[in-house]
């Protein structure tokens, strides 16, 4: 499945980002979790990631999700948003008063497909800015969303090296045939400012 095959317009994207924000807010304030919108897309299974960034300096505050379509989209958004706000091991759990100083971003993923070319050819099989990548080897794994390469202006090779580091593997791990590399695409929506207008990225 290509990203163009995920039928998500800006209206749905805005609802998805709002659901993520409301879910995190409900968890942090010990309130009832929000209802999932009725739109059919929220009841289809998709991989999804929630990214929370500080505002206005745009530093990562939490990012967790599910690369595989384990959950219906609405449920996946709620879970990933709560985990990003409270369980990202790189950060302390958010406090409720932080909600007005962060933005929420949602990435809705296609199903990952293994990159089956010769390992040395893997950079050529990855489209920077379009593909996200996953590495799996011997119980270790890591994932980088497509927008990471764009944000840090990485080449495909640099993107793969960053993936090896993210997965806790050795430098150049992507050249090793037994390291499984998969790629996926994502449709990304995010708030321009806290509680603000949502745009597609």
Swiss-Prot record:
What is the protein's given name?
Answer: Protein TV1384
Q: Which Gene3D superfamilies match?
A: Hypothetical protein ph0010, domain 1 (3.30.700.20), Hypothetical protein ph0010, domain 2 (3.30.1490.150)
Query: NCBIfam families per the record?
Result: AmmeMemoSam_A (TIGR04335), TIGR00296 family protein (TIGR00296)
Q: Where do the coiled-coil regions begin and end?
A: none
SUPFAM superfamilies, per the entry: AMMECR1-like (SSF143447)
Instruction: Locate the transmembrane regions by residue number.
Output: none
Source taxonomy lineage? Archaea, Methanobacteriati, Thermoplasmatota, Thermoplasmata, Thermoplasmatales
The AMMECR1 domain covers 11-200
């Amino acid at each position: 499945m290509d990203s163009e095959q995920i039928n998500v317009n800006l209206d749905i994207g805005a609802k998805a980002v709002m659901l993520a924000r409301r879910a995190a807010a409900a968890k942090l304030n010990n309130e009832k979790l929000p209802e999932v919108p009725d739109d059919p897309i929220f009841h289809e299974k998709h991989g999804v990631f929630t990214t929370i960034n500080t505002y206005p300096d745009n530093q990562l505050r939490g990012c967790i999700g599910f690369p595989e379509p384990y959950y219906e989209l609405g449920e996946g958004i709620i879970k990933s948003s709560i985990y990003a706000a409270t369980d990202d091991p790189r950060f302390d759990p958010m406090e409720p008063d932080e909600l007005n100083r962060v933005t929420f971003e949602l990435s809705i993923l296609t199903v990952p497909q293994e990159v089956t070319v010769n390992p040395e050819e893997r950079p050529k099989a990855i489209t920077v800015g379009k593909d996200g990548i996953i590495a799996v080897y011997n119980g270790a794994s890591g994932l980088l969303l497509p927008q990471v390469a764009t944000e840090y202006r990485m080449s495909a090779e640099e993107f793969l090296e960053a993936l090896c580091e993210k997965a806790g593997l050795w430098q150049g791990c992507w050249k090793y045939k037994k390291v499984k590399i998969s790629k996926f695409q994502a449709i990304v929506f995010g708030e321009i400012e806290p509680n603000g207008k949502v745009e597609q990225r």
